[in-house]
Regions:
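Short amphipathic alpha-helix that is part of the acyltransferase structural core
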Residues: 1-29, 33, 38-40
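Short hydrophobic/aromatic beta-strand element in the GNAT-like acyltransferase core
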Residues: 36-40, 50, 90, 95, ...
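A short, internal acetyl-CoA/4′-phosphopantetheine-binding micro-motif in the GNAT/acyltransferase core
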Residues: 94-104
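Conserved acyl-donor/pantetheine-binding loop and adjacent beta-alpha core of acyl/acetyltransferases
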Residues: 52-95
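Catalytic cores of nucleotide-enabled group-transfer and carboxylate-activating enzymes in metabolic
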Residues: 120, 146-147
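C-terminal "cap" of GNAT-fold acetyltransferases
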Residues: 127-138, 146, 152-170
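Conserved beta-hairpin
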Residues: 35-54, 67-68
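Conserved acetyl-CoA-binding loop-helix of GNAT-fold acetyltransferases
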Residues: 104-118
């Protein structure tokens, strides 16, 4: 269910203050400002999970180390040479959270698959080749299991890692 400005938001606790706070305090403002759209997964009137999406792009910088060139070549491997660009269209998963009492039931994986299907369907008005995420360290294994790859090695010591999924691989 898409969050609208008049959608009531019941209590939600995924165990992460930032993710809880986004849903409670920021999601409607992001919608109003046209920065992101949040989708709720509900059982009866209880929010069990949510994710938010915004458009993004995978961009090649002009200064690349050899390792980054290798990573960028992996991104473009399935794109014909004549169609390769410096920026590829993407959708970013800005937030994804599952309430604590529903963790471990595969809801996160189902949300990732729903995002994939949303952008593989013919209902979208713009091209979108990749899904991106700035994954918390605690979620790196989750995204890895869902076939996301690291975009760079520069963020190995950061709190989040840039990751991508190629929709063409589905």
């Amino acid at each position: 269910m898409r969050l609208e400005e008049d959608t009531p938001i019941s209590s939600f606790d995924c165990g992460d203050i930032d993710l809880n706070g986004f849903l409670q305090n920021d999601a409607k403002n992001y919608l109003k400002s046209m920065l992101a759209v949040t989708y709720l997964i509900k059982v009866e009137n209880e929010i069990v999970a949510y994710f938010c999406l915004s458009y993004d792009g995978l961009t090649r910088t002009n200064i690349l180390t050899e390792e980054e060139k290798t990573l960028w070549n992996k991104v473009g491997r399935n794109i014909p040479n004549s169609k390769r660009r410096k920026t590829y269209p993407a959708v970013k998963i800005g937030r994804l959270a599952v309430a604590k009492q529903f963790a471990g039931f595969g809801i996160g994986r189902h949300m990732i698959n729903a995002v994939k299907m949303m952008y593989l369907s013919e209902q979208h008005h713009a091209g979108c080749r990749f899904i991106t995420v700035d994954a918390y360290r605690s979620a790196l294994d989750f995204y890895g299991k869902n076939r996301f790859r690291y975009l760079t090695t520069k963020d190995e010591c950061e709190d989040t890692r840039a990751m991508y999924f190629d929709l063409k691989s589905v």
